[in-house]
Amino acid sequence: KQLIRKNNQTNPSSLLLLLHSHFLSSVSFGVSPRISEMEIGAGIGLYPLHRCKTIYLVRHAQGIHNVDGEKNYKAYMSHDYFDAELTQLGWQQVDSLRKHVHSSGLHKKVELVISSPLMRTMQTAVGVFGGEGYTDMSDVLPLMVANAGNSSRAAISSLNCPPIITEESCREHLGVHPCDQRRSISDYQFLFPAVDFSLIESDEDKLWKADVRETIEELAARGKKFLNWLWTRKEKEIAIVTHSGFLFHTLNALQNECHPDVKKEICSHFANCELRSMVIVDRSMLGSDVSVTDYPGKIPKGIDLPSDVTVVEDNINDE
């Protein structure tokens, strides 16, 4: 009652918030350090469903550059690895992830696949999420032609699978390393006929520089911009096939306010062909989606003042 008089709160909803805040500030947190850390520093978040998207983050399978690069970082400077394609082991990793995507039912949930426009990511994207049973007799273009990027693989069908588009902003760390330089879009369109390249503005690679390496801050900012761009898309469940550096620096830059174990789960380096399912939340009204599952109530209309609000109003009047 003293709290009510002091703050002159007469609006019921404001009063409830005030009482809730006062209760929390008055609670003694005499609990174990682990519980305190989890409950105080990493509380549960609650958001409207229509302001959330599920994203399936995938790092590409093993590329030819990874084999030597993981032994000696300087190997990434070799022009032999220009726009590196997948190794045969990489294709086996693709096959394994494809089996998981189908056995788990993800192939029925994913509405859109976004791929970085490099050979290894597009090979991974079409191999994991593409259709099956392509024949030359089909009048539908394949996602990938036979033996694209020295794959020794048959053509991959574009039937019965989500659309696959490419987007420059989810590319790997730009500059210096030839493995991260892309070919012309004209070349890719021949190798990946049914992949959508319409978002790529330039045929030649104007983003990659031989003597300038993108800073980590620039990469992280690009990653955040990419995630914000997802809110311009209508799809709610999106697979993104991209790169280790892009994923690591983008996710770490988000500074998630969560338990350290959860943060580690989100931000640790991805293995080749690893998939992680995550939810992103539009907390800044970036998107304009309207909920298709919410229901406004009051149909037909009637008196429906909540009983707890009525009690609060009665208590105020008693004073």
Predicted feature residues:
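Intrinsically disordered, low-complexity basic segments at termini and long loops, enriched
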Residues: K1-S28
